[in-house]
Every structure is written in C-alpha cells, then in structure tokens.
Amino acid sequence: MTPDLLTPPKEMDSLSMEGLESAPGGWFDCEVQKAGPAEDGTIFIGLRHTGGAFNCWFSATPTMKREMLATALAALSGRKVVNVYLTSTDEYSVINRMYVVA
C-alpha cells in the first residue's frame, strides 16, 4: 500500500524499508507544501524539491521539532523556499536542518 501524500503516517514502524538502499541525503532547496503534528508528537513536513527530484513527507529531528515546525510554517505562509539538510531523500527520512531563504 502506498502512503497518501496528504496524510502523514500514524505509525512509523509500518514504513520499514529493511533491506532497501537509501537515497543519498544532503542539502536541498525545497518548497514547504504542508506541515503539522501527528498523534505521537512527530512533526511531519511535506517538501517539494525545487528541481523536481522529490515531493514527499519528511519528519523533523526530534530535538528541534518545534523550531522546525515554526520555520516550516513561516516559509509556508510567506511563500519562501527553505534550505534543508536531509538524511536521505526517501520519504519519511529526517530533516536535520532547515533555513528559510530570503
């Protein structure tokens, strides 16, 4: 079953990709498409790469989840691009850094 891009997952355990190789991570310029919390407190942020490489959900690193949600909402409401550092470009990977681009 393919996850719905409009709804973050309820359980991260169901997203196990055991045995599959991850896409490389790094720095990317993205548009924030959506952002918000899940029932367990995880913050999910939907990002679309400005170059079209991906358009999917990512989770904010737990130690900075409130700050990342605030940054994502600021970018979303201001229609700004964000520069993010991702562990991988695979869906539901972790966002480690996020900066709004002026």
Region spans (language model):
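Exposed beta-strand/loop interface patches that mediate assembly or binding
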Residues: T2-A102
